[in-house]
Amino acid sequence: MLKKLPLPIWTIALPLLAWVAYFSPISGLGIAYVLILTTLLIGSVLAAVHHAEVVAHRVGEPYGTLILALAITVIEVALIVSLMLTGGPETTALARDTVLAAVMIILTGMTGLCLLVGGVKYKEQEFSLSGISVSLVALTAILVLTLILPNYTTSKAGPFYSPVQLGFAAVLSLIIYGAFVLTQTVRHRDYFLPPGQDGNEDAHAEPPTNKTAALSGLLLLICLGIVVLLAKALAPDIENAVINAGAPKSLVGVIIAAVVLLPEGLAAYRAAKQNRLQTSLNLAMGSALASIGLTIPAVAIVAMITGMTITLGIDMKATVLLLLSLFIIVLSLKTGKTNMLQGVVLLVIFATYLFTIVVP
């Protein structure tokens, strides 16, 4: 049966083995168990990338990238909410830290790597300026309203929103993200299509069948689910390693966010390497918008039900780096063409973000 499937066997076997290992009673193996889970985690990430590309090829742009962004974000939100409900008061800043880490990884790390790889291989790459402008408008608004404005409101002291303000911010986030999805998929779908596909072999390749795409879609969800579960299972070991290294505990959130975003990051990297920068940017911007546009409303609902106070406002250091990232992204993408220098600058900002976490 598997031989007749137009899918590599490893993309089916590894995620299933990961699920078996996760629920099997072999945790007593200690470091060997950690190594097994880590290996299966990497394999599941690679399998997720393959299945995402199959689905994206079948449904076309921008639906393929939107599907991957939504799938990962829904699982990410589920992970955050579950940790908040079980972690108690110590997790009040979890959503903020995770969202900030995800946005910085996407804006500077993922995008910077794509621009660098594409610039080195093709010197210049083109994309649709209209789609990126729409994405940045929506992303900037949500980031300021949810991560920066809470520091300056007076209804509640500190980096917090009052319950009414939190509900209002959640509704605004949903409105902005909903308007973005409507624009991307219905009103102005052409904004998010590559400016020219004549030289793109992938654009002319035979798309997979509906059966293959459906199977890949199911396997994609299976892969993403086990990636998040394995990341959660490995979190204590990661936390111990970070503490033993003398690094701040906040670095754990960055590591987990990076693991969860690996499927999208690898898919974006491969697209840029194949001279499909539009796909890379659709993935990056769509992921950032979905991450914050869906996480904040979900966290707001949890806060209202449990009475938990949610920390949203970021500190001045993070604010400076976030605004710098947005400013550089706008300058880098304002012409519809990119080169390796812009990628290098974004990666430098990403390195600075990581460095200031370890050495604040």
Please provide the spans of the model-predicted regions.
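Hydrophobic alpha-helical segments, chiefly the membrane-spanning helices
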Residues: M1-P360
